[in-house]
Amino acid sequence: MPAPTPKRADGRGATELRPFSVDWDPMSFALSSLIVRTGRTAVLCSVSLEEDVPRWRRGNGCGWLSAEYRLLPGSTPQRQSRELMKLSGRTQEIQRLIGRSLRAVLDMDALGERTLLIDCDVIQADAGTRTASITGAWIALRRACDLLRSQGVLTQDPIRQQLAAVSVGLIDGTPLLDLDYSEDSRADVDLNVVTAGDGRLLELQGTAEQAPFSRSELDAMLNLAESGLQELMQGQRHALATAAGSAIS
């Protein structure tokens, strides 16, 4: 007899995403900005442009993309101290993940010698901040590139394809999609999945928190993530359709 599906605090089914939404233009001076919300998790994502590249990148006509990630002080139940002189290992890991994922779907040659700077600042953390950051940052990046093309700054579209990320967990033997904190903190397995629009994987981050997991359990979690990512990508396209200056509909 199969184990009963764990009850989720917010009433969702095992295969349901948290509510997903995007609020546009919270910042007047950024090239592109938005607040992405997945349930109670909210991340401010913004894109800025620099007409330069890192020194080691100069002279070859190619651009660059860099990402920064921070938890704002009031984003968690206990205040997060600002990371000033030294970043925590977690912060460094996450911002590298964000930058690495976005660069994988970006044509650096099409940028010319310019740098796109991505900032992801967590306003409220209820788990899934890294996946929300990636999903929201891609939307902001897509719009920024559309605006740069409309202004004549870019002559080619540097974005090769879509990108999104989601978490999956295993609780009491049952795969659950898009964990909130109450689930993430007790999951037997925590898995973050990043994929491109064509379905190919960009990154898997999986950890057995309590006990090893099987190949069949991994496959079940990946299948669940795939369905959630398709839905998130629809949400991305819908968000872009509501924003001026985007080519996606």
UniProtKB/Swiss-Prot annotation:
The keyword Membrane does not apply. Coiled coil: none annotated. Belongs to the RNase PH family. It comes from Parasynechococcus marenigrum (strain WH8102). Its EC number is 2.7.7.56. It catalyses: tRNA(n+1) + phosphate = tRNA(n) + a ribonucleoside 5'-diphosphate. One of its GO terms (biological process) is rRNA processing. GO terms for molecular function: 3'-5'-RNA exonuclease activity; tRNA binding; tRNA nucleotidyltransferase activity. Phosphorolytic 3'-5' exoribonuclease that plays an important role in tRNA 3'-end maturation. Removes nucleotide residues following the 3'-CCA terminus of tRNAs; can also add nucleotides to the ends of RNA molecules by using nucleoside diphosphates as substrates, but this may not be physiologically important. Probably plays a role in initiation of 16S rRNA degradation (leading to ribosome degradation) during starvation. This is Ribonuclease PH. HAMAP family: RNase_PH.
